[in-house]
């Protein structure tokens, strides 16, 4: 397993109001020192892929905890959609992470478009619960924009946000619904982790290995062709009411 960005994402988190071409990062061999600040889910994902396909795996770590999806999305996606624009205008400003549209994309994603990546792992959404109504359009627009920037229809696998006591009526569930609808976008896959959260007062669930296992199963099944691996669970189809019974049907 080879890594890019273990130090970059801690030391050199940067923003820009215009797309950049260069980034201060390099490939390193995976070892305890260099993976200290690397994504745990990303590492465990890469480890399982490496063990399954018996080939080197390169992982690029480009993330910033707490950020809304708007800052990872090119401005044209936001400016062309009134619903997305409304959500972006309602974002609060914070000292610890950017909420300006496209700022993280310009500095931390645009320079990576020169890499011939295989796919993307995405775990985000908690900072968009207040504007859940815009998330489906925002997220699917972002995916399409990234693929356009790479000129490649790569797989995009993401994690549905975990249950958390947000203190605001149903916003977490509504964001999860938006993420579920987003899975209709071609060549995407969503991992559900609602059963992996023993404490809904902790917004950072601790079972990272299990989340990575589900992501790697999805990649192995959908991309690497290992169809014997079951990567998707049942999906809700419809409901009906019969007397005192509420009947759910899944596919």
Where are these regions (language model features)?
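Carboxylate/His-rich catalytic cores and anion/metal-binding grooves
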Residues: 6, 45-46, 52-82, 87-88
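Loop/turn elements at helix/coil->beta-strand transitions in domains of secreted/extracellular proteins
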Residues: 6, 53-58, 115-119, 151-157, ...
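Single conserved hydrophobic/aromatic residue that forms the stacking wall/gate
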Residues: 1-5, 9-10
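The substrate-binding groove and active-site-proximal loops of carbohydrate-active enzymes
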Residues: 29-40, 91-99, 123-136, 162-168
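Active-site-proximal beta-strand/loop segments in catalytic clefts of secreted hydrolases
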Residues: 11, 60-65, 72-75, 122-127, ...
